[in-house]
C-alpha cells in the first residue's frame, strides 16, 4: 500500500474515458439518461439481487479487513474494482457500445461490444507491458473466447434484469475477489 497514489493514478487515467462518456451521455440525453443507460433499479427482485451482490462485496471486504495485514490495499481494491473496473467496463461496453448498436441485429449488438470488452483485457493479461506477438497469439487462443462469452453473459444479465447495476456488482465481486490472494 506504500505506492497507492501511483496505483490510483494508473487506475484513474483509463477511467477518464468512461467518466467522460458518462458526462457526455448525461448532457446529451438529459432526462432520458437514467432510463436509456439502464441506471435505474426498479422492482423488488432487482433491489434484492443488488443487495445480495453488494452484501457479497461488503462481506468479502469485512473478511479481508479482519484477516489481511494491508487494509489500505483492501479498501483501495474495493474502490478500484467497483468503480474503475465494475462500473467503468460495464458502462462503456454494456451501455455506451450497445446504445450505439441498439438498432443492429442481436449478433452484432452482442459480439461487437463484447469483443471490445475482451480486448480491454489484453494489456492486463500481459502485465501492462509491451504486447508481443506471442502475447497476442496466447490471448487470441486462450482468453478471447472466454472473455467474449462472459461479456455476452453480463450483457444478457443487463438486458434481462433491465439495469446495469446487477452486472456492475457481479463484475466487481468477481474481480474484487482477487483480494483473497494478497
Q: What is each stretch, according to the model?
A:
Residues 1-27, 76:
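Alpha-helical transmembrane segments in multi-pass membrane proteins
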Residues 2-6, 38-42, 101-111:
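Membrane interface segments of multi-pass transport proteins and intramembrane proteases
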Residues 3-13, 40-46, 137:
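Interfacial loop-to-helix junctions that mark the boundaries of transmembrane helices
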Residues 5, 63-73:
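Membrane-interface helix caps and helix-loop-helix hairpins in membrane proteins
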Residues 15-28, 49-65:
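Hydrophobic core of alpha-helical transmembrane segments in multi-pass integral membrane proteins
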Residues 24-34, 157-160:
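Structural signal for the C-terminal ends of transmembrane alpha-helices
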Residues 33-36, 97:
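Cytosolic, membrane-interface loops and tails of multi-pass inner-membrane proteins
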Residues 58-60, 71-182:
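Transmembrane helix-loop-helix hairpins at the membrane interface
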Amino acid at each position: 500500500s506504500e505506492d497507492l497514489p501511483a496505483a490510483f493514478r494508473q487506475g484513474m487515467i483509463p477511467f477518464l474515458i468512461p467518466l467522460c462518456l458518462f458526462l457526455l451521455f448525461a448532457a446529451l440525453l438529459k432526462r432520458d439518461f437514467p432510463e436509456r443507460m439502464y441506471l435505474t433499479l426498479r422492482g423488488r427482485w432487482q433491489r434484492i439481487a443488488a443487495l445480495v451482490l453488494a452484501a457479497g462485496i461488503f462481506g468479502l471486504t469485512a473478511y479481508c479487513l479482519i484477516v489481511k495485514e494491508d487494509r489500505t490495499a483492501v479498501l483501495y481494491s474495493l474502490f478500484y474494482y467497483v468503480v474503475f473496473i465494475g462500473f467503468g467496463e460495464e458502462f462503456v461496453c454494456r451501455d455506451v457500445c450497445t446504445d450505439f448498436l441498439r438498432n443492429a441485429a442481436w449478433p452484432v449488438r452482442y459480439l461487437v461490444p463484447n469483443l471490445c470488452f475482451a480486448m480491454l483485457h489484453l494489456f492486463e493479461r500481459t502485465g501492462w507491458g509491451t504486447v508481443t506477438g506471442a502475447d497476442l497469439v496466447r490471448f487470441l487462443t486462450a482468453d478471447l473466447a472466454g472473455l467474449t462469452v462472459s461479456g455476452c453473459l453480463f450483457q444478457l444479465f443487463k438486458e434481462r434484469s433491465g439495469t446495469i447495476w446487477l452486472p456492475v456488482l457481479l463484475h466487481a465481486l468477481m474481480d474484487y475477489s482477487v483480494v483473497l490472494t494478497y
